[in-house]
């Protein structure tokens, strides 16, 4: 047993300095605001945009550890209580801290607001989730940013409208967001199918290292799970992979994570440029 077999007590951390909520920032490792700004500037110098994400209203255990009253008593403390006005006060303050001013901490054109894996057990909470999603899309837009979300609106199917125009959706699992329906609604998609592009180091599920040979020879961003769009479909903006460190204390170091990232990054970068065409066989690409 770990954490007394209580999910609400598991390890969680927010890794960016916060002056609005000083006790929120992790003490065992974090970026100061200046460090994060400098990192973004470094990326800009090589034409890379860092898109910061504050994931809510699920995956938010770090927030409810800091402010327990905004955690959901029904769905677990890693879910925010969407019926509590303090939840919105907290999230408004957090986003505002990094978005306001002439030189905001979040420098780029886009900000990801999360919206991943919230419970859909109750129709009433589904409508509140959709309301939350729409609210924070518009909130980050009010600071001049383009909003990005995780695909969840098939899982959270409901009546409350959620803004889709100029919104980018990370399409990770078709059961959560059916790709063609999302495109029909107006979203632009980033293809990140979990069964092909998820790395969870030394966990025993998903990939420890991506199957780069399979990706190189068979996959393009037009393949969103089992749905295959036309190559260069304007609704598909590109693709990506993810590294999720679900297990801490399992012997995986930062260097180990980098070792998993490099071949994945190299392979997907080539696929973003070339699509279905392959200038060299995989074996030759792998040697290079």
Identify the meaning behind each predicted range.
Residues 1-143, 147:
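Substrate-binding cleft of carbohydrate-active enzyme catalytic domains
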Residues 3-5, 55-59, 116-118, 152-155, ...:
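Active-site beta-loop-alpha junctions enriched in small/polar residues
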Residues 17-18, 150, 190-193:
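Short, conserved beta-strand edge motifs with alternating hydrophobic and charged residues
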Residues 47-51, 108-112, 146-148, 166-170, ...:
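Structural preference for beta-strand elements that scaffold enzyme active sites
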Residues 93-100, 155, 176-177, 224:
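Alpha-helical scaffolding within the catalytic cores
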Residues 119-132, 159-174:
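Short glycine/threonine-rich loop-to-helix capping motif typified by GTGT followed
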Residues 149-156, 282-283:
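Acidic carboxylate-rich catalytic motifs and surrounding loops in phosphoryl-/glycosyl-chemistry enzymes
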Residues 159-167, 174-288:
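Flexible, acidic glycine-rich loops studded with aromatic residues
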């Amino acid at each position: 047993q770990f954490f007394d077999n209580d999910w609400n007590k598991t390890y969680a951390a927010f890794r960016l300095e916060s002056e609005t909520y000083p006790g929120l920032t992790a003490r065992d490792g974090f970026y100061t605001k200046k460090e994060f700004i400098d990192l973004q500037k470094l990326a800009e110098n090589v034409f890379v945009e860092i898109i910061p994400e504050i994931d809510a209203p699920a995956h938010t255990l770090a927030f409810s550890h800091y402010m327990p009253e905004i955690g959901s008593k029904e769905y677990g403390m890693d879910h925010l209580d969407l019926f509590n006005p303090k939840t919105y006060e907290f999230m408004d303050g957090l986003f505002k801290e990094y978005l306001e001013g002439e030189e905001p901490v979040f420098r780029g054109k886009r900000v990801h607001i999360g919206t991943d894996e919230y419970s859909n057990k109750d129709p009433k909470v589904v409508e509140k989730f959709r309301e939350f999603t729409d609210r924070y899309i518009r909130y980050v837009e009010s600071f001049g940013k383009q909003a990005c979300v995780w695909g969840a609106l098939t899982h959270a199917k409901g009546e409350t409208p959620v803004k889709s125009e100029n919104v980018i959706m990370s399409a990770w699992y078709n059961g959560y967001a059916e790709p063609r329906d999302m495109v029909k609604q107006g979203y632009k998609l980033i293809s990140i199918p979990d069964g092909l592009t998820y790395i969870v180091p030394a966990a025993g599920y998903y990939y420890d290292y991506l199957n780069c040979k399979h990706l190189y020879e068979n996959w393009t961003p037009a393949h969103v799970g089992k749905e295959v769009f036309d190559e260069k479909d304007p609704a598909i903006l590109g693709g990506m992979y993810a590294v999720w460190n679900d297990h801490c204390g399992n012997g995986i170091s930062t260097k180990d994570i980098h070792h998993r990232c490099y071949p994945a990054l190299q392979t997907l970068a080539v696929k973003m440029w070339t699509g279905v065409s392959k200038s060299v066989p995989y074996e030759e690409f792998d040697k290079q």
